[in-house]
Amino acid sequence: TFVGNIVDHKILSEYFSKALVCISPGQAGLGVLTSMANSVPFITRRDAITGGEIFNINSSNGVIYDSIDDLISLICDISDNRDKYIKMGRNARNYYISCRLPEHMVNSIIDSIDYVLRK
């Protein structure tokens, strides 16, 4: 069901609580981290538009695929192996908590600024 743009995090969390995966073939932006924060693995195409968020996806917390045939196979796998993707969602949440909280990103920016200032 297409519901349009949702900016309210409570409503968004309700949708994520019912989702097994989040599939976004053409975009891998902030939705990657939002999905991971909600224990939902993110699935996208290798050439998706991204601001770098796609680099957070690895085989234990999401899937990056190459072709429409890969996506078809992936959807079949999701249907046949639900527990695999539930585990992947837990891994996504753990990754988010350990590496991608806003505090982690702020510290990375501070470290980058400090590095440049030392040069």
Task: Please provide the spans of the model-predicted regions.
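Acidic donor-binding loop of glycosyltransferase active sites
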Residues: 14-27, 40-41
